[in-house]
Amino acid sequence: MKSSKNDTFVYRTWVKTLVVYFVMFVMSAVVPITAMFPNLGYPCYFNALVDYGALNLTNYNLAHHLTPTLYLEPPEMFVYITLVFIADCVAFIYYACGEVALIKARKKVSGLTDLSAWVSAVGSPTVLFLAILKLWSIQVFIQVLSYKHVFLSAFVYFLHFLASVLHACACVTRFSPVWVVKAQDNSIPQDTFLWWVVFYLKPVVTNLYLGCLALETLVFSLSVFLALGNSFYFMVGDMVLGAVNLFLILPIFWYILTEVWLASFLRHNFGFYCGMFIASIILILPLVRYEAVFVSAKLHTTVAINVAIIPILCSVAMLIRICRIFKSMRQGTDYVPVSETVELELESEPRPRPSRTPSPGRNRRRSSTSSSSSRSTRRQRPVSTQALVSSVLPMTTDSEEEIFP
């Protein structure tokens, strides 16, 4: 069966967007690598943004100079860029496999809207557009960091973080109700390459994206307070404590969002929790390396407690997710969309007619009326019907006494 014109248009749009995504992926892979080598057009090494040797938590912002605050050092920044690059490589392989799977599955289209449902299951054009926006913004972020523009880099990374949040939600929910997602998944032919891509490879890619989102939450928190610390007359220690507290608060909203909304679409979404553990390790490294600086500013205990709360809250949220998974497995409740064909059995139960004493002068008229009524009742006897949307109930002839008193 051929797909509808609307589905064909959606598929062609998806293919063109996928080509742009592949090109943007290559560019996002080239930019970080070239930015690490000198004499290739980048003025500075983007990883070395903050010199922790000059870190003083009791100082205030110095005009016309980059005041060092809490940020990623070259090893941590390299780990972050590498993990994001690995996730993008896996996503590249996933979308390439998805395109091959859709080409093979087009031969098994059995409905007018099957192709668009499969495209949405793999990744709609909206998801690809958000992925392209992520790849573009991370390139701009690296280039801006090379020029040491901390204010512009914070703004660019805010756009990148916003695109990452929307992209993660789109990968999990497809911005559709649960029953629509179930209907799209049920339309995929079983034991096919498309089935394997959607139900086995896509959860892995989604969890990798969620893990990267946790790391991006850390970088976003540090970037915001790095820009604030170099824009206003604030103490460096306050900016460090503010960055830690922001990274402590933001994941709580994601934990709540996961249990309220995202868990209905993807139960085993542990990528964000794993990313939070890695981000906590990255955040605690400066506290360990430069312990004397934090101790002299009397911030070591406060920052250490706040940093320790982050993995504790993550562990609690992960335990809640695991308990809810086991609870749903015990209940065995799985909601599926109702079939389009509904069978209704309409049983015929004659209604009791009130007994009245007929008038002698109208016996002949009543007998003729009752005979016609019995014939119409036989014609309108309810039968078992099969309706696609709604069933028409048989008309009943209750009593002719209301017409012929």
Swiss-Prot record:
The keyword Transmembrane helix applies. It is found in: Virion membrane; Host Golgi apparatus, Host trans-Golgi network; Host endosome membrane; Host nucleus inner membrane. Keywords: Disulfide bond, Glycoprotein, Host endosome, Host Golgi apparatus, Host membrane, Host nucleus, Membrane, Transmembrane, Transmembrane helix, Viral envelope protein, Virion. Its main location: virion. Residues 386-397 have a biased composition (Polar residues). Residues 346-405 are annotated as: Disordered. InterPro entries: Herpes_glycop_M. It comes from the Viruses. The chain crosses the membrane at residues 18-38, 77-97, 122-142, 150-170, 193-215, 246-266, 268-288, 300-320. It holds the Pfam family Herpes_glycop. It is a multi-pass membrane protein. GO terms for cellular component: host cell endosome membrane; host cell Golgi apparatus; host cell nuclear inner membrane; membrane; viral envelope; virion membrane. The keyword Membrane applies. The highly charged and proline-rich cytoplasmic tail might interact with the virion tegument. Interacts (via N-terminus) with gN (via N-terminus). The gM-gN heterodimer forms the gCII complex. Belongs to the herpesviridae glycoprotein M family. Envelope glycoprotein important for virion assembly and egress. Plays a role in the correct incorporation of gH-gL into virion membrane. Directs the glycoprotein N (gN) to the host trans-Golgi network. This is Envelope glycoprotein M. It comes from Epstein-Barr virus (strain B95-8) (HHV-4). The gene is gM.
